[in-house]
Amino acid sequence: MIILASSSPRRREILGKFFDIKVYPSEIDERSNARSPKERALDLARKKALAVHSRFPNDTIVAADTIVVLDGEVLGKPKSEREARVMLEKLSGKVHSVITGYCIIHNGKVVGGVEETKVKFRNLSEDLIEWYLSTEEWKDKAGSYGIQGYASIFVEWIQGDYYNVVGLPIKVVVELIKLGFKPRPKR
């Protein structure tokens, strides 16, 4: 059985397209002493996977952590609408990185990696930002946006894996199979 160590409906949807999965969110302290954003994303993904693996040692565990980085500043999940507005204003007209660290545990093997996707936002008007905030789609999303939803109209271009920006790179599934992890395909 594949267990997704996340409460993210986006990750559940992506992984669930390929495999029958169970969801068991990890309850970890999401602080990290890692020096770089990539190291932080990988560290948190690994912590999530290991926490869930301790409960389900005979299953395949998939975990991920996604962060948005603009000019070296990590833009996490906003705690308020005001904070979301500030993040969107910062991202307006700029290129930023979406970094997802992932970790897979199967039969004692621990495999992790990092994917980075560049995203360029068009210039966002104050009215557009206010409208987006009113949708409440910004809640619980790194960088205050979900590319798969209303915020898709913010994007001028993307370089890299679209699903990485959503929260789980397709590469995770490919790595899972390529490395000999043999979960049952979805019927």
Curated annotation (Swiss-Prot):
<dbReference type="Pfam" id="PF02545">
    <property type="entry name" value="Maf"/>
</dbReference>
<keyword id="KW-0378">Hydrolase</keyword>
<feature type="site" description="Important for substrate specificity">
    <location>
        <position position="66"/>
    </location>
</feature>
<dbReference type="GO" id="GO:0036218">
    <property type="term" value="F:dTTP diphosphatase activity"/>
</dbReference>
<dbReference type="GO" id="GO:0005737">
    <property type="term" value="C:cytoplasm"/>
</dbReference>
<dbReference type="InterPro" id="IPR029001">
    <property type="entry name" value="ITPase-like_fam"/>
</dbReference>
<dbReference type="InterPro" id="IPR003697">
    <property type="entry name" value="Maf-like"/>
</dbReference>
<feature type="active site" description="Proton acceptor">
    <location>
        <position position="65"/>
    </location>
</feature>
<dbReference type="GO" id="GO:0009117">
    <property type="term" value="P:nucleotide metabolic process"/>
</dbReference>
<dbReference type="GO" id="GO:0036221">
    <property type="term" value="F:UTP diphosphatase activity"/>
</dbReference>
<keyword id="KW-0546">Nucleotide metabolism</keyword>
<comment type="function">
    <text>Nucleoside triphosphate pyrophosphatase that hydrolyzes dTTP and UTP. May have a dual role in cell division arrest and in preventing the incorporation of modified nucleotides into cellular nucleic acids.</text>
</comment>
<keyword id="KW-0963">Cytoplasm</keyword>
<comment type="similarity">
    <text>Belongs to the Maf family. YhdE subfamily.</text>
</comment>
<protein>
    <recommendedName>
        <fullName>dTTP/UTP pyrophosphatase</fullName>
        <ecNumber>3.6.1.9</ecNumber>
    </recommendedName>
</protein>
<feature type="site" description="Important for substrate specificity">
    <location>
        <position position="148"/>
    </location>
</feature>
<feature type="site" description="Important for substrate specificity">
    <location>
        <position position="10"/>
    </location>
</feature>
